[in-house]
Amino acid sequence: MTTTTTTSNTSNNSNAQFNFFKMCIGRPVVVKLNNGVEYRGILEVVDGNMNIVMEQTEEYLNGQLKTKYGDCFLRGNNVLYISAQPRK
């Protein structure tokens, strides 16, 4: 019984995460990597492995803008968090 509940909770948690990402498509986000680098841009795609595609991406290190990219692909195993930002 406990295993079923845990599986159900895990499934519900995954659905909530997927719905959050779906809501963020086309919106500004901040993605922070495990190494401390932040990417700010428009979220285009997130897959089940947390691989991320962004447009109009800016790379920040220690709060300072380092580079601007048109398109950016971030590998999911490097992602620490994704934060939705207010529309500009």
Swiss-Prot record:
GO annotation terms (biological process): maturation of SSU-rRNA; mRNA splicing, via spliceosome; tRNA processing
GO cellular component, one term: P-body
Keyword Nucleus found: yes
Annotated ranges, domain Sm: 16-88
UniProt main location, coarse: cytoplasm
Family listed: Belongs to the snRNP Sm proteins family. SmF/LSm6 subfamily.
Protein name: Probable U6 snRNA-associated Sm-like protein LSm6
Organism this protein belongs to: Dictyostelium discoideum
